Amino acid sequence: MTQENIPVQPGTLDGERGLPTVNENGSGRTRKVLLFLFVVGFIVVLLLLLVFHMRGNAENNHHSDKTMVQTSTVPMRTFKLPPPPPPPPPAPPEPPAPPPAPAMPIAEPAAAALSLPPLPDDTPAKDDVLDKSASALMVVTKSSGDTNAQTAGDTVVQTTNARIQALLDSQKNTKQDAGSLGTLLHGTQTDARMASLLRNRDFLLAKGSIINCALQTRLDSTVPGMAACVVTRNMYSDNGKVLLIERGSTISGEYDANVKQGMARIYVLWTRVKTPNGVVIDLDSPGADPLGGAGLPGYIDSHFWKRFGGALMLSTIETLGRYATQKVGGGGSNQINLNTGGGESTSNLASTALKDTINIPPTLYKNQGEEIGIYIARDLDFSSVYDVKPK
């Protein structure tokens, strides 16, 4: 900086160098600093507001999650006792005996309406009527004119029926003459079905549900018997809100000894279920495998050796006897054959033994603890024993 550029300050001596002034740019820098501080403060305030807002949302979400966890979707279940039976109504007084109805005459048969006028040569005879109106029958003796009228009426009816039958036959022949296309143009008529709503789905176990169950008893199809199983999965209502059959409930049933050759399943009918709370309901539903197949599979004992063992042994004895007979017969002429006719008797014994044992039925065994299914064959309504109480 040269000497000429330095302004002369008052109160200084000539030739003395004074301090440079800073007042020219001081006000501009102050405004910039204040603007910067204002912007920084505004950003800090926005950040604080954003932090408070996010914290409030997090607390609200936590509170709503806690409320959702504490609130159960399954309403509380209570039991209600059935109402006491109403008292028997008093016996109604006996009505007075109705007066006897007057006897009404029985009309003559309708065939008399078709009577024709008598011929000139015929002399109508007088009707001889035996009136028994008080009884259930009335005997009427008709004259020859009435007999002719009856015959004429029967002839008219037969003629009319013959004409109607001829008309129907002609229509049938017309349809047959139309060919196979006319027959195909008539579809099968089916009945319509109306939709309906299920009653109170909160306490309804709908038809078609499958109950998973574990056998408590061993099944042996030698003789008919009873069976029991334990429910292994909770069963809820049709809308999934109310627990109807708890896990651990006992189901009882029965089976028949009807296994035949070629069959690998046994039919079991499950009749009743009892819950741990003492609720019982009739099932009357068939047993199934875990996938819903009809019947319960198991181990099959076909009793092969019992059925064919005796016949095989007798056949073997017969074969060995014939072989020995041939050996003995070919040894020389001085040998005596003592087995003459023995082969036929042994064959008869084998046939008899096979006839007695061939019809032994197979036996199915199924051990306890195996998983089975029960196909619900009807809608089960628990509304008479269960009720829901709002929280």
Curated annotation (Swiss-Prot):
The keyword Ribosomal protein does not apply. Belongs to the TrbI/VirB10 family. It comes from Brucella suis biovar 1 (strain 1330). It is found in: Cell membrane. Residues 1-26, 76-105 are annotated as: Disordered. Coiled coil: none annotated. GO terms for cellular component: plasma membrane. Transcription of the operon is maximal in early exponential phase. It is a single-pass membrane protein. The chain crosses the membrane at residues 33-53. Its main location: membrane. The VirB system could be required for the establishment of the replication niche in the host. Induction: Specifically induced within macrophages by phagosome acidification. Induced at 37 degrees Celsius in minimal medium, suggesting that nutritional stress is a regulating signal. This is Type IV secretion system protein virB10. The keyword Membrane applies. It comes from the Bacteria. Residues 81-103 have a biased composition (Pro residues). Keywords: Cell membrane, Membrane, Transmembrane, Transmembrane helix, Virulence.
